[in-house]
């Protein structure tokens, strides 16, 4: 079987990456590695992801980094408890996983009061054209009616 060359086509989207910045996280367990890992696993479960494995590390004196590897790609987190801040990536491939639900679960569990969500379609050729990334901030927790999240997923008008 001959290997087919990749066509660099800007409309060939292989996945969506949500880059989420959660600010003013008020949950007191924000530096508890077991609770952060369980929160990430719960976000993956509620998003209908197929969990493969997870790995988390607790820094000294504070802070946690971790990743949940899923069949559909990954969820990653880095926390700065001293700032009440978490950086989260939700990268999804295919149309089974609900990345928005993962974002909602993490925002709620961490007690985030403000957020910034960037959305990027990942795929073949699009980066060369610079057409794929956009961001929007919100001054409220991410919930089921979050206009920021709807916008990041291409379902809203861009009003936070």
Swiss-Prot record:
Gene3D superfamilies xrefs: S-adenosylmethionine decarboxylase
Source superkingdom? Bacteria
> Which top EC class is given?
lyase
| Post-translational modifications | Is synthesized initially as an inactive proenzyme. Formation of the active enzyme involves a self-maturation process in which the active site pyruvoyl group is generated from an internal serine residue via an autocatalytic post-translational modification. Two non-identical subunits are generated from the proenzyme in this reaction, and the pyruvate is formed at the N-terminus of the alpha chain, which is derived from the carboxyl end of the proenzyme.
What UniProt keywords apply to this chain's record, in alphabetical order? Autocatalytic cleavage, Decarboxylase, Lyase, Polyamine biosynthesis, Pyruvate, S-adenosyl-L-methionine, Schiff base, Spermidine biosynthesis, Zymogen
Name the coiled-coil region(s).
Answer: none
A family per Pfam = AdoMet_dc
- List residues, modification Pyruvic acid (Ser): 73
The cellular component terms of Gene Ontology attached to this UniProt record, alphabetical and capped at eight, are:
cytosol
The record's remark on the cofactor is: Binds 1 pyruvoyl group covalently per subunit.
Q: What pathway is it annotated to?
A: Amine and polyamine biosynthesis; S-adenosylmethioninamine biosynthesis; S-adenosylmethioninamine from S-adenosyl-L-methionine: step 1/1
Q: What is its EC number?
A: 4.1.1.50
Provide the GO MF annotations for this entry: adenosylmethionine decarboxylase activity
Sorted alphabetically, which InterPro entries does this protein's record hold? AdoMetDC_fam_prok, S-AdoMet_deCO2ase_core, S-AdoMet_deCOase_pro-enz
Q: Which cofactor does it need?
A: pyruvate
- Annotated family: Belongs to the prokaryotic AdoMetDC family. Type 1 subfamily.
**What does it do?**
Catalyzes the decarboxylation of S-adenosylmethionine to S-adenosylmethioninamine (dcAdoMet), the propylamine donor required for the synthesis of the polyamines spermine and spermidine from the diamine putrescine.
- Which protein is depicted? S-adenosylmethionine decarboxylase proenzyme
Q: Please report the organism this UniProt entry assigns to the protein.
A: Pseudomonas paraeruginosa (strain DSM 24068 / PA7)
Q: What is the lineage of its organism?
A: Bacteria, Pseudomonadati, Pseudomonadota, Gammaproteobacteria, Pseudomonadales
